[in-house]
């Protein structure tokens, strides 16, 4: 009655609906309908339209309400909302702040020549100049035992075992924005995100809103934080100002609220920093491209995962498949997971890496025909036997690994020894994990070569999961785009491009050895993925 719909088609349809819905929501965020009514009382006019003389003042205070004790750190006498600037100032730290306390910045935009405390038309915002984080563990040379020279207070802090307690860190950047466009708001359609930043006063029959001042919290990155100790009497603060469009302001408010919500759910400052980097390190055009690229990356990831699981679930024989390559993928994913765990990476990255490691362990179990028998709490592992065709594949696989080991082992050992001598680490475990993961990133693609060698010897590629390969190939090319857009380690960026080379060789072999999936090969196996229906006699 209804046409048959595959699960993949359903997922693609849901994905397209999600992308369209997201585009509609984003349009609603960045677009604000201006007031088009003729009556003045129906609109809210901008204070900046009269071009008043303004002044920007920045104070520090121990409490956010600034009931006394505030100190002026910067004043911009002739402030122009359309002129951006960057000023470096030195801020004196009170004694309470140096003793693991907090410090606030109070930013005032007010009439020139008038104290902000006496200006009825001033706008101000309060933001923290400090945040709490765990101190970075010290790194030492594992050969000599020497570390970087520390100040006496830092040595005392380490000796008192305070590395497990959050300490106050200094935010060295303060980024300010003011909406420069003279936008006319409709009183009956005022966006809720802008409303909390808006101060309005009555002038006759007209409603006038004061300048929209905004403190960009997304620009506060972990890399800019400085640990505060009792000897830190002064610390630098870079005050940056630039005008901002209304659409970008609304978008930034939503993103800032999203990051704050994640922190309320238990995300640490470092976890939130991973998300901030997506928005701060790229402009809005790249950000839009990143969204679409990431959405398709997620789709192809899911489809590759689905087809890969389906392929291995029904896999009965390892004919034409490199078991060494399967074992290597399992090892490399576990090493990368342990490396991310050691580096205290965000849960957004850590959890998928952990799930991927479990799946690779399951593949190894299928590839080596391992059966686990539990006798009480003691497991017994039984390995299945290989038939003649699988033994032939295993011979080619072993031969390829033999040639590969002549190149791979000296490179990995040499890199590990070099790192041990010239690089500092937190512990021996950290050195082992870093050496292994560097080997995975730098030379991991070499372990894809045994499968190419097996394909060459068998003159066949029919045994490979080509649907999963194609989806992974799309993701590989998407990763190439990300390699230019997103900040990442150089080794990971090179890893994106090296996979392209190997996959192009796979494509060449597929063209060289065409596949008739309906034909039964010399091992009595057909690679037709569509099961044939039962025949019925009339």
UniProtKB/Swiss-Prot annotation:
Alphabetically ordered keywords of this record: Apoptosis, Endoplasmic reticulum, Glycoprotein, Lipid transport, Membrane, Transmembrane, Transmembrane helix, Transport
Membrane topology field: Multi-pass membrane protein
Q: Which GO terms describe its biological process?
A: apoptotic process
Tell me the GO molecular function terms: phospholipid scramblase activity
**What cellular component GO annotations does this protein have?**
endomembrane system; endoplasmic reticulum membrane; membrane
- What reaction does this enzyme carry out catalytically? a 6-(alpha-D-glucosaminyl)-1-(1,2-diacyl-sn-glycero-3-phospho)-1D-myo-inositol(in) = a 6-(alpha-D-glucosaminyl)-1-(1,2-diacyl-sn-glycero-3-phospho)-1D-myo-inositol(out); 6-(alpha-D-glucosaminyl)-(1-octadecanoyl,2-(9Z)-octadecenoyl-sn-glycero-3-phospho)-1D-myo-inositol(in) = 6-(alpha-D-glucosaminyl)-(1-octadecanoyl,2-(9Z)-octadecenoyl-sn-glycero-3-phospho)-1D-myo-inositol(out); a 1,2-diacyl-sn-glycero-3-phospho-(1D-myo-inositol)(in) = a 1,2-diacyl-sn-glycero-3-phospho-(1D-myo-inositol)(out); a 1,2-diacyl-sn-glycero-3-phosphocholine(in) = a 1,2-diacyl-sn-glycero-3-phosphocholine(out)
Q: Where does the protein end up?
A: Endoplasmic reticulum membrane
Protein origin, superkingdom: Eukaryota
UniProt family annotation: Belongs to the CLPTM1 family.
Q: What is this protein called?
A: Lipid scramblase CLPTM1L
Q: Which gene encodes it?
A: clptm1l
């Amino acid at each position: 009655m209804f046409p048959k719909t595959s699960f993949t088609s359903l997922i693609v349809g849901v994905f397209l609906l999600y992308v369209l819905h997201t585009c509609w929501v984003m349009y609603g965020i960045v677009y604000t309908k201006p007031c088009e009514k003729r009556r003045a009382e129906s609109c809210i006019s901008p204070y900046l339209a009269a071009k008043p003389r303004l002044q920007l003042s920045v104070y520090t205070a121990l409490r956010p309400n600034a009931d006394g004790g505030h100190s002026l750190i910067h004043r911009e006498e002739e402030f122009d909302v359309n002129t951006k600037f960057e000023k470096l100032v030195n801020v004196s730290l009170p004694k309470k702040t140096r003793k693991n306390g907090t410090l606030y910045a109070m930013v005032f935009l007010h009439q020139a020549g008038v104290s902000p405390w006496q200006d009825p038309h001033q706008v101000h915002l309060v933001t923290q100049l400090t945040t709490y984080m765990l101190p970075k563990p010290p790194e030492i040379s594992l050969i000599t035992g020497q570390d970087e020279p520390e100040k006496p207070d830092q040595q005392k802090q380490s000796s008192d075992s305070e590395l497990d307690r959050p300490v106050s860190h200094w935010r060295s950047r303060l980024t300010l924005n003011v909406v420069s466009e003279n936008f006319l708001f409709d009183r009956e359609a005022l966006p809720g995100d802008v409303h909390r930043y808006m101060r309005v006063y009555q002038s006759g029959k007209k409603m006038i809103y004061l300048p929209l001042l905004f403190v960009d919290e997304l620009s506060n990155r972990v890399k800019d934080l400085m640990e505060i100790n009792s000897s830190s009497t002064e610390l630098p603060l870079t005050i940056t100002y630039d005008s901002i469009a209304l659409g970008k302001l609304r978008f930034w408010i939503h993103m800032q609220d999203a990051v704050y919500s994640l922190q309320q759910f238990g995300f640490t400052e470092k976890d939130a920093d991973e998300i901030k980097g997506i928005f701060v390190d790229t402009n809005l055009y790249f950000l839009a491209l990143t969204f679409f690229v990431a959405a398709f990356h997620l789709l192809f990831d899911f489809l590759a995962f689905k087809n890969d699981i389906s392929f291995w679930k029904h896999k009965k024989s390892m004919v034409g498949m490199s078991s060494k390559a399967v074992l290597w993928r399992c090892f490399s994913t576990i090493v990368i997971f342990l490396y991310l765990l050691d580096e205290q990476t965000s849960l957004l990255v850590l959890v998928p890496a952990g799930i991927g490691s479990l799946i690779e362990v399951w593949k190894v179990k299928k590839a080596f025909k391992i059966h686990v028998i539990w006798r009480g709490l003691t497991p017994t592992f039984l390995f299945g036997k290989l038939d003649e065709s699988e033994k032939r594949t295993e011979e080619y696989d072993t031969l390829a690994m033999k040639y590969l080991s002549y190149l791979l082992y000296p490179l990995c050992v040499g890199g590990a020894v070099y790192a041990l001598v010239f690089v500092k680490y937190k512990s021996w475990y950290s050195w082992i994990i870093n050496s292994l993961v560097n080997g995975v990133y730098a030379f991991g693609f070499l372990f894809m070569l045994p499968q190419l060698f097996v394909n060459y010897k068998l003159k066949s590629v029919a045994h490979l999961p080509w649907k999963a390969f194609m989806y992974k190939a799309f993701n590989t090319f998407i990763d190439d785009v990300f390699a230019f857009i997103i900040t990442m380690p150089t080794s990971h960026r090179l890893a994106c491009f090296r996979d392209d080379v190997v996959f192009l060789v796979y494509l060449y072999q597929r063209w060289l050895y065409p596949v008739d999936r309906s034909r039964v090969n010399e091992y009595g196996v057909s690679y037709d993925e569509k099961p044939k229906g039962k025949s019925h006699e009339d």
